[in-house]
Amino acid sequence: MALPRCHRLRQRDRFPALYRGGRKLSTPSLLLRWLPQAEIESVNESRFAIVISLKVHKRAVRRNRLRRRLQAALLRLRDRLRPGFDGLLTVKPGLDLDTSTSQFLQELEDLLTRAEIIHGRQ
């Protein structure tokens, strides 16, 4: 299941700001860049985009499957997300594509907890 629209980062002008001035944290397979949302925006929900380059896998089918699994992991954590953040999740090359969704969930939860975007562990 895909992320709800309110949790998707779709504004193209926000991406350069995340690359330039976003704070960064990483794990062996994921990189998170995040920024607080601008005060101009009245969006309360935290929004995320997932980037998977050709370096991860050349086949779009595999990249899309990976994207869906990351979205599923984000969906499980959505109730614990603090509002007001824009995040960009980048999958690093060399990731084992057969990693289970529960491992993604654990790694993503660790990353978001360190970034203080979610409320503590469950």
From Swiss-Prot:
Transmembrane segments: none annotated. NCBIfam families: rnpA. The keyword tRNA processing applies. Pfam families: Ribonuclease_P. SUPFAM superfamilies: Ribosomal protein S5 domain 2-like. One of its GO terms (cellular component) is ribonuclease P complex. This is Ribonuclease P protein component. It comes from Synechococcus elongatus (strain ATCC 33912 / PCC 7942 / FACHB-805) (Anacystis nidulans R2). The keyword Plastid does not apply. It is an enzyme of class 3 (hydrolase). Gene3D superfamilies: 3.30.230.10. Belongs to the RnpA family. Its EC number is 3.1.26.5. GO terms for biological process: tRNA 5'-leader removal. Keywords: Endonuclease, Hydrolase, Nuclease, RNA-binding, tRNA processing. Consists of a catalytic RNA component (M1 or rnpB) and a protein subunit. One of its GO terms (molecular function) is ribonuclease P activity.
